[in-house]
Amino acid sequence: MPAHIIDGEAVAAKVLNTLKQEVKDLKAKGKTPRLVAVQVGESPASKVYVKNQQKSCEEIGLNYTLDQLPENTDEAGLIQRVQDLNQAQSVTGIILQMPLPQGINARTVQAIIHPLKDVEGMNPANMGRVVYGNPNPGPCTAVGAVELLKSLNVPIQGQDAVVVGHSEIVGKPISLLLLALNATVSTVHVFTKDLASYVKRADILFVAAGKSQAMWLRFQRERQKNPATPAPDISPLIKADMLKPGAVVIDVAINRIPKSIDEKGNPALNEKGRPAIVTVGDVDFEAAKDVASYITPVPGGVGPMTVAMLLKNTVETAKIQFA
């Protein structure tokens, strides 16, 4: 039987509807959460993201402000601006917009954001709360992915859960959140021997490696230095035959890669003569959906939940500040 496709949009919509009412209730008391996104310079790559952030905030009634600093802002200047926002009572949430210019350490600045205004859950104090299974606020993608699993009402306690990827903002916190739910957790990564043997025993599988995009970007860099660089393997990291039949598969990765490449690594072109780019996960979705019991699509799976958790963090931290 084909897998049930997990509709992240639908689950996220339920969260947003609840938040919309909570914001309405706060406003009735004269209290409005305000989210400030701090951006250094103007990044074309983040324009769409910022626009979507603002739209999402407005849909549930949050105030949203883009605080755009000059391109030549240094780390000290950015830290000072964050400290000012920490002190501003009208600001209840702060986002640090990526990418940051060279010379500015994102970790350093994120550690300056007040834990109660850190709606991305990246302050070390908030990351530490994940250890206690109390991510409020917690890293949005990790929390969103686990909330998506919980929405399925499938057994978690005692199940073998495997997390592919150990990044600080996704893989590690997912593992900790699963441990808090009493799953038996294995975390695997680029240095793990025999990845397939771990994946095969997973009742619950989270995949957050971003392998295909990493391979493609590395190829592009190396090709500039050496045109004879061999074409990369940008096929999905997780193949259908690696899965345990009936596994629940949560694909967290977002890979923006060519639809196909030739033997020299040249991408297929679209009708406009430009590289045909697709968005895919780390799992071979079409084949895996015939093996798994539940599976997330990419896009449309974890992505909407990331946005929903960002807004949930914003509302929840505001409620604490208003209390």
Segment roles from a protein language model:
Residues M1-K31:
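Positively charged, low-complexity intrinsically disordered leader regions
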Residues K24-T32, D84-Q89, N153-I156:
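Glycine-rich phosphate/diphosphate-binding loops that line cofactor/substrate pockets in enzymes
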Residues P33-G41:
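Short beta-strand segments enriched in small/hydrophobic residues
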Residues V40-Q54, N136-W216, A228-A253, I257-P267, ...:
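Glycine-rich phosphate/diphosphate-binding loop of Rossmann-like nucleotide-binding domains
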Residues G61-N63, D67-G138, D290:
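Phosphate/diphosphate ligand-binding glycine-rich loop within oxidoreductases
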Residues Q97-G103, G210-Q213, I254-I257, G301-V302:
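Short glycine-rich anion-binding loops that position phosphate/pyrophosphate groups of nucleotides
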Residues R107-N123, M127, I250-Q321:
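Rossmann-fold NAD(P)-binding glycine/threonine-rich loop
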Residues R218-K225:
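Charged/polar low-complexity intrinsically disordered segments
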